[in-house]
Amino acid sequence: MSDFDAIVVGAGPAGSCAAIVLARAGKRVALIERGPFPGSKNMYGGVIYPRILDELIPEWWLHAPIQRWITRRSTMIMTETQALNVDFRTQAWGHPPYNGATAYRPDFDHWLADVAVEAGTTLICSTTVTGLLHGANGHVSGVTTDRPDGDLTAPIVIACDGVNSFLAKQEGLYGAVDADNYTLGVKETLGLPKHVIDERFGVRGDEGVDI
């Protein structure tokens, strides 16, 4: 008998959501995170798009650690000599159902993983999945880890270990991608007083901006 019905690798939003669905279906689920806690190694920015949360966690906004609600979105298209900016604002986005929110990813990811644990998921942190196990038929049968107690088995492994998934590459599911199809992003978190943020971005209260 396998250790679990399913193993989810990566406790970011995708991994926690997958674990929530499986656990609620009565499956034995392991959610493995290589960081010391969910959100400690997050990569993408702090804007949360709530469509999936609306389906998984009714009235999630009453419990999630949200900083601001997105009421303004701004997109800029630039060339070497020109720039076009499209700016959209609406007060309707500041009320349920929300269009988006800003959050500190360590706080948000921790909260979402806790929802998965409450549903019955086993959360395993500070553990790196180093590879996949295969049964006699060649099918994936679990994962190898850097833990002293070794491997974990399950008939289903869901790789939520990021856009450059090591596990997907190992299984040949992630083909070579031309460098021209990549973009480089830089993320920096700055602390500013609330009144400074409101003044600079033209917002008030718990309104937020996605640029």
Locations of regions flagged by a protein language model:
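N-terminal FAD cofactor-binding segment of flavoenzymes
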Residues: A25, G35-T81
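Conserved Rossmann-like nucleotide-cofactor binding loop
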Residues: A14, F37, N164
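Short beta-strand to alpha-helix junction loop
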Residues: G94-D114
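Predominantly flavin-linked oxidoreductase catalytic cores and closely associated redox partners
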Residues: V115-I211
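N-terminal Rossmann-like FAD-binding beta1-loop-alpha1 element of flavoenzymes
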Residues: D3-L31
